[in-house]
């Protein structure tokens, strides 16, 4: 056998050739990113919405809107509210193996969840709320062991809540409300911080591990037990066991003697009966007197003309007070009453009911609203707002519009556009009532009131100041809500952005209110002087609102958040030195001493640079020239870059 040896020169040539061959092969990371890119393009083809403006000429998807990459892999896909529709096909998520955050919320996606979602085993945050997914919650979800946040609310999922959720041992948020789930809730021993199963056909008792959540986590179900009412078997007091047979207790003779001794005479019994009758009569008499007083008080409150005369001019976020007492009005005053104190005439029976939007659960009607107790929350630009308490768990806000001069058909067309707005940073409009003399809007009640009240309320001793984390989260939430409004079309704007129209949930999530109302009311109601300090300089006609005007108003709110100063209090002379001009007049190196709210400085020593950048953004938004102001989408992007996602953002789904 012959053995051939290559000369040194031949070996060198071979080594170079092999090296070049290896270099010409695609790197594994490049292959993976290409697979991610292919998967994203497949998703676009299947369910593409209006904002899929991806530049497919780019070889890397990492610069596409909503896509985030790390180490040359797609790790986050955020496409909320971009009109995605249809079923998600199999084979997409099988390639997105490094995905950690997936947000497809507030779209129109339907069908069942794809089975290959389980291959995205690194998923930590999954936001699918506000779609049309149906069928049972798939078992594939329970293999995502790293999942921390899961939101499947407001879909059409059916079946029971699986005990497979117990596999998700890191889960802190589970939202399943507004589906069609049935059966009982399994005992979920999980480190949950947020949990909600409201508006489902659930029954049985609430497991012990979930009883730590408040009652609003279980609304509109047939569940029982803490924190809701006791279950029937818990209410029943077990009777004492009786002895069987005819056995005579050993102490029967002694008990017979006691019975004789304790037996009451006829006179004593008669005295007791007479005393009870007299006592009962006194109680009835007292109740009649109290009811008469209450009836008189209520009838006075229902007199709409009296209420009109007494309602004071107050900011929209404060309560109306007379002689130190909050006006207590029935919902008849807050609801379907006419301007002359009589029921609306000539409008037909159709005007005598509340009209609910979309698939909103009709948990009450106009009669319930009329019977509810209510109180005046405040009088704002578009009318008076009331808090109506329907029952122990249902509280709504009713806005009684003024100066609405339009026909039923036109009002219906415009208000249905408002009711169709659906975003987590907007106060949802649940229902409306229309008659010749009354126009009412029913919203979710926001328990924390407005940003204005929180910023400018009691600033004395005992006040809990807002730290920078909360303020910046409020700012981003409000910006997202306004950006959503603007995304509905170039002609869609708010027209009345101010801190009293930014309402807050218990967890200080911002929700923009009063959107879409500027086009409903007359010019007298939208007098621009009512928005002193927030109005863009080019706005002279309150009916001609614009998106650039909204950006200006939002910039004022942003400066208000950082300075702690109310814009209406910043006018120093007849020329109107408003808040933006005052901030601009202060040199940047003096902002810490002159501009920043002193409450912030005592709490946020590490975030002053971020605060300064937010001030700069507020000044950009309040440019005197509309064309120099950024779009709200750009404002949101800049704010998110300034304030990276934190744990609190994730808990509140700021994705």
Swiss-Prot record:
Induction data: By not induced by salicylic acid.
Phosphothreonine modifications at: 394, 526, 622
Gene3D superfamilies: Phosphorylase Kinase, domain 1, Ribonuclease Inhibitor, Transferase(Phosphotransferase) domain 1
Binding-site residues for ATP, renumbered to this chain: 377-385, 399
Keywords: ATP-binding, Cell membrane, Leucine-rich repeat, Membrane, Nucleotide-binding, Phosphoprotein, Receptor, Repeat, Signal, Transmembrane, Transmembrane helix
Name recorded for this polypeptide: Probable inactive receptor kinase At1g48480
Keyword Phosphoprotein set for record: yes
Annotated signal sequence range: 1-32
Organism: Arabidopsis thaliana
Domain Protein kinase: residue ranges: 371-646
Region span, Disordered: 234-260
Membrane-spanning intervals of the chain: 269-289
Phenotype seen when the gene is deleted: No visible phenotype. Probably due to the redundancy with other receptor-like kinases.
Sample GO molecular function, one term: protein kinase activity
Cell compartment(s), UniProt: Cell membrane
Tissue expression as described in the entry: Highly expressed in seedlings and leaves. Lower expression in roots, stems, flowers and siliques. Detected in the vascular tissues of roots, in the trichomes of young rosettes leaves and hydathodes, in the floral abscission zones, in filament apex and stomata cells of anthers, in inflorescence stems and in sepals.
Species lineage: Eukaryota, Viridiplantae, Streptophyta, Embryophyta, Tracheophyta
Biased composition (Polar residues): 237-249
Principal location class: membrane
């Amino acid at each position: 056998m012959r053995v051939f040896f290559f000369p040194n020169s031949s070996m060198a040539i071979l080594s170079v050739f092999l090296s070049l061959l290896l270099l010409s092969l695609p790197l594994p990371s490049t292959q993976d990113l290409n697979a991610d890119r292919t998967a994203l393009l497949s998703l676009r083809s299947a369910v593409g919405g209006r904002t899929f403006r991806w530049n497919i000429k780019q070889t890397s998807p990492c610069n596409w809107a909503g896509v985030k990459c790390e180490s040359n892999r797609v790790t986050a896909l955020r496409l909320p509210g971009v009109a995605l529709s249809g079923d998600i096909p199999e084979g997409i998520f099988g390639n997105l193996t490094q995905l950690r955050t997936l947000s497809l919320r507030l779209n129109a996606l339907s069908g069942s969840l794809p089975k290959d979602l389980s291959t995205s085993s690194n998923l930590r945050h999954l936001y699918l709320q506000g779609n049309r997914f149906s069928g049972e919650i798939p078992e594939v979800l329970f293999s995502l062991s790293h999942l921390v946040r899961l939101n499947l609310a407001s879909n059409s999922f059916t079946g029971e809540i699986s005990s497979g959720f117990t596999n998700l041992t890191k889960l802190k948020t589970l939202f399943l409300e507004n589906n069609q789930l049935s059966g009982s809730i399994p005992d979920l021993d999980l480190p949950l911080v947020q949990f909600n199963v409201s508006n489902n056909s659930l029954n049985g008792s609430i497991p012990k591990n979930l009883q730590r959540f408040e009652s609003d986590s279980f609304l509109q179900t047939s569940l029982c037990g803490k924190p809701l009412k006791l279950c029937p078997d818990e209410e029943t007091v077990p009777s004492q066991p009786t002895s069987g047979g005819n056995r005579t207790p050993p102490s029967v003779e002694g008990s017979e003697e006691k019975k004789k001794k304790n037996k009451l005479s006829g006179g004593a019994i008669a005295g007791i009966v007479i005393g009870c009758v007299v006592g009962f009569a006194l109680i009835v008499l007292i109740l009649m007197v109290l009811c008469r007083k209450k009836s008189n008080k209520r009838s006075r409150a229902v007199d709409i003309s009296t209420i009109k005369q007494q309602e004071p001019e107050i900011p929209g976020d404060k309560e109306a007070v007379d002689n130190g007492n909050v006006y207590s009005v029935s919902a008849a005053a807050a609801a379907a009453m006419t301007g002359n104190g009589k029921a609306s005439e000539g409008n037909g029976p159709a005007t005598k009911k509340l009209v609910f939007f979309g698939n909103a659960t009709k948990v009450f009607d106009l009669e319930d609203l009329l019977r509810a107790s209510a109180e005046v929350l405040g009088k704002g630009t578009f009318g008076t707002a009331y808090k109506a308490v329907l029952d122990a768990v249902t509280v709504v806000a009713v806005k009684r519009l003024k100066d609405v001069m339009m026909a039923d058909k036109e009002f219906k067309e415009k208000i249905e556009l408002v009711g169709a707005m659906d975003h987590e940073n907007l106060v949802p409009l649940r229902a409306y009532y229309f008659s010749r003399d009354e126009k009412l809007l029913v919203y979710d009640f926001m328990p924390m009131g407005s940003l204005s009240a929180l910023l400018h309320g009691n600033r004395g001793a005992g006040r809990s100041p807002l730290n920078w984390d909360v303020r910046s989260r409020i700012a981003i939430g409000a910006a997202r809500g306004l950006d959503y409004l603007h995304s509905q079309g170039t002609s869609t704007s708010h027209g009345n952005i101010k801190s009293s129209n930014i309402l807050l949930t218990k967890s200080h999530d911002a929700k923009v209110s009063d959107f879409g109302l500027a086009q409903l009311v007359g010019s007298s109601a939208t007098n621009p002087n009512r928005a002193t300090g927030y109005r863009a300089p080019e706005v002279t006609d309150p009916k001609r609102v614009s998106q650039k005007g909204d950006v200006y108003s939002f910039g004022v709110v942003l400066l208000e958040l950082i300075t702690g100063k109310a814009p209406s209090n910043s006018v120093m002379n007849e020329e109107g030195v408003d808040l933006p001009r005052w901030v601009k007049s202060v040199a940047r190196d003096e902002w810490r001493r002159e501009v920043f709210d002193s409450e912030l400085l005592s709490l946020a020593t590490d975030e002053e640079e971020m605060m300064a950048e937010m001030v700069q953004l507020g000044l950009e938004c309040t440019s005197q020239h509309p064309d120099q102001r950024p779009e709200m989408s750009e404002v949101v992007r800049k704010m998110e870059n300034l304030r990276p996602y934190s744990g609190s953002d994730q808990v509140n789904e700021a994705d």
